[in-house]
Each structure stands twice: as C-alpha cells, then as structure tokens.
Amino acid sequence: MAMWRAPSAAGQLLGRALASTAAQTSAGSKKVVGVFYKGGEYADKNPNFVGCVDSALGIRGWLESKGHRYIVTDDKEGINCELEKHIEDAHVLITTPFHPAYITAERIKKAKNLELLLTAGVGSDHIDLPAAAAAGLTVAEITGSNTVSVAEDQLMRILLLLRNFLPGHHQIVNGEWNVAGIAHRTYDLEGKTVGTVGAGRIGRLLLQRLKPFNCNLMYHDRVKIDPELEKEIGAKYEEDLDAMLPKCDVVVINMPLTEKTRGMFNKERIAKMKKGVTIVNNARGAIMDTQAVADACASGHVAGYGGDVWFPQPAPKDHPWRYMPNHAMTPHCSGTTIDGQLRYAAGVKDMLDRYFKGEDFPAQNYIVKAGQLASQYQ
C-alpha cells in the first residue's frame, strides 16, 4: 500500500493511522535506516556483538534478500549528519537508547515517507512521541528485551556502592593498600530497606532478585503488582512516594521518562530521603536534577549514586556526574549485553517481518499506534 501525505493535518493523520493500525505495508522496496553505536576495534571480537553499527543487528542480508535498502550509521548530530541525509525518504527508522538519535518534530516533518519508528531496546523517550502520534506514525519497541540485563545491573550497582568496592579496586590499580579507607563506609545489603520507584517488568524482577538477600522490600507505582507475586516477594506497596523515600536505605529508579517524571527527583525530593541513602538509576538521566544529585553526593546526604543513564547522551566531558564523589556511573550499557542485543535484534527482525506482511505487532510493543500513546507515556 503506497503511503501519501494529505494536504491537511487531519487527512495526514487519518491516512497514516489507518495504515499503521496494521503496522503498515504491502508491496515495494522499503528504505530502512538504522542508527547504532560504533563497534570500532571491538566489532569483530564477538560474532554475537550485533548491536553496533558494524553488525547492524545482523539483519542486512535478510533485508537485502527481500529487496529492501538498509542504511546504517552512527552519525546522528547536526544538519549535515548521515541521519539527516537519509531520513527524508526513509520508510522505517531504527534507533536505540544506547546511542539515541533524537527524533524531533522537525525531523518527523522532514521525513516525507516515514511510516514506522522502531526502538532496538526499551525506552522511546528520544522520540517526540506527541509529534509522532500527530503525524500518524507507528512507534514500537522490543518490550522485555532488556529486563534481565537491567535488573541484574541494578543489583550489581547496589552491591558495588554498599560495599564501597570501586575505591578498593582503584587502590589496587594504583598500587595502594588502605583497608580503613574502604571499611569505614562499607555495609551489608542484608537487613537494608530497598525501595523501587516503579514496579514494571524490571522493577518486579529486581525485587525478586533481592529477596534472597533478606532485605526489607518496598515499591511505589501507579498500580499494585499481582497480590500473589507481592506476597511471594514479600514487598510492601507504598502509595505515597514521599512517605516511602525516608524509609529507604537504597532507592532504585524504575520508571519511564515522561513530562510528568522529568526532573522528578529534584533538590527538595532528594532532601526527603534518608541521610546516607544509596540511589541507583538505570531508567533515564533526565528523571533526576543533575546538579541536585551532584550536590547531594558532595555533601554526603547521598552516600552513593550509580547508573548508566545520563542527560544528554553521550555525556559531555564536563558533566558533573563524572566528577562527583562516590559514584558508580558508566556509559549507557546495562541493557545492551550480548544476550540483550540478541533479544532486541530478534525482536526488530520479527517486527519488520510483520510490518512487511501488514500484520500487527505484539500489543505490548506499541508505544504509538493510530495516533494514541501507550499508557506509560500519557
């Protein structure tokens, strides 16, 4: 089915929405553009390292065998970047949270043939979702592809921070040996109160992973988790976030970035937390007030902050989180383990196959469908 741009906004929305209901198309060669991070010297070190631009999700041969064009790049910034050159006539754009190409309303307007925006991974906040909805585009992601990867990473960072591991490691690398310098702020996880702000797939799995550590588990979300699972985990629901925070030794952020959650953890909210709290955030950097986090770490009100999400990404060299004390920050990598890459690469291939056949995607994968945003982004 050939796509077209109606002269009116209403006509455009109707035309695109009708097509996107079945996730588009039918006949003809399609131009698929992918934006991924560089593999560089590491691209050939693992045949399953498919998430980089060099391997391009491992779907080039499959796409080209079906007569489609597949353009991949890591160049996404500025008016002369490769993404700008190719977005105008692209039918499908694949992006990733780990090297986010910010798809603005201006870029959407420029993309005359665009029908489908796919996120290779989870989290589509790098896309102007209201603009995509207004244009009648379909936006989808690989829901669940990084659940295990991120939950394991969160547990790791909790332990790294509580056990004061990184300063000890740096001592060894630097030829030092000072037990007191580590032990004076090292704690067990057992008996601590851990609260997750958000109890979706990742939050629930984290609570399950924490149960063997004999922690006091709490969670805040818009809705309660299944009563049987809640009982099995032994987690307590807290409807009032600000009532939960002062009780927690560890706070883990597990919510999507929306206009409601942007900057949600500001100076005032962080001040409500227990002095010496540990915070882990693998959700989105913009949920936090950047300077408020750095100041709280410097003052000692926050004993440690860890995560892999920043705003913006890549983080500039002068980003305060790079230099604040007692942090366990890395580039955005928790959801792009080799196992995670294989899951979201397979998911992208499956959804492209459905798209070419005019079939619907799994319902949970839709972020924007027929002009409507998924509930978590409303």
UniProtKB/Swiss-Prot annotation:
First-tier enzyme category under EC: oxidoreductase
InterPro entries: D-isomer_2_OHA_DH_cat_dom (IPR006139), D-isomer_DH_CS (IPR029753), D-isomer_DH_CS1 (IPR029752), D-isomer_DH_NAD-bd (IPR006140), FDH_NAD-dep (IPR033689), NAD(P)-bd_dom_sf (IPR036291)
GO molecular function: formate dehydrogenase (NAD+) activity; NAD binding; oxidoreductase activity, acting on the CH-OH group of donors, NAD or NADP as acceptor
GO cellular component: chloroplast; mitochondrion
Signal peptide residue numbers: none
The organelle targeting sequence, given as a residue range: 1-18
Organism: Oryza sativa subsp. japonica (Rice)
Catalytic activity, reaction form: formate + NAD(+) = CO2 + NADH
Protein name according to UniProt: Formate dehydrogenase 2, mitochondrial
Keywords: Mitochondrion, NAD, Oxidoreductase, Transit peptide
Predominant location category: mitochondrion
Family: Belongs to the D-isomer specific 2-hydroxyacid dehydrogenase family. FDH subfamily.
Subunit structure, as described in the record: Homodimer.
UniProt cross-references to Gene3D superfamilies, sorted A to Z: NAD(P)-binding Rossmann-like Domain (3.40.50.720)
Highest taxon, organism lineage: Eukaryota
Residues engaged in binding NAD(+): 147, 201-202, 221, 256-260, 282, 308, 332-335
GO BP annotation list: formate catabolic process
Matching PANTHER family: FORMATE DEHYDROGENASE 1 (PTHR42938:SF9)
Record-linked Pfam families: 2-Hacid_dh (PF00389), 2-Hacid_dh_C (PF02826)
Site features described as Important for catalytic activity, chain residue numbers: 284, 332
Binding site for substrate: 122, 146
Subcellular location: Mitochondrion
Protein's job: Catalyzes the NAD(+)-dependent oxidation of formate to carbon dioxide. Involved in the cell stress response.
EC number: 1.17.1.9
